[in-house]
């Protein structure tokens, strides 16, 4: 990202922190790493991914699969999706129209954010496998 950022850096950082905090509040207490993905295809359909690790990133679990099996709704997960949409709108206003966003966070609060700009016609298992291979390490 570096000097390529056209958006307000503090606003962007605040949104990253908000997303991380919204999701962290829903994860198991022993989480060590999380990776959040938000991908948008050409039709505007979005895919939302959340993976977490309890062993410092050696293996990851698909939190979205767990969310649908919970007795109580994981409100923070759905709030974070809304924050991802807000992030996308902030970027669009600066003519920074990305198709993919990834946020990686560890338990210490260290994070990295990455954006991709390749057009996505529609989501395929191969694209999701590529995303997991890139951001779950």
Role assignments for model-derived ranges:
Residues 67-87:
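Short, hydrophobic/π-rich interface segment
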Residues 17-25, 80-92:
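Short, non-transmembrane amphipathic alpha-helical segments
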Residues 29-42, 90-106:
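Short glycine-rich, low-complexity/disordered patches
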Residues 7, 11, 72-75, 91:
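Conserved aromatic-histidine-acidic binding/catalytic patches
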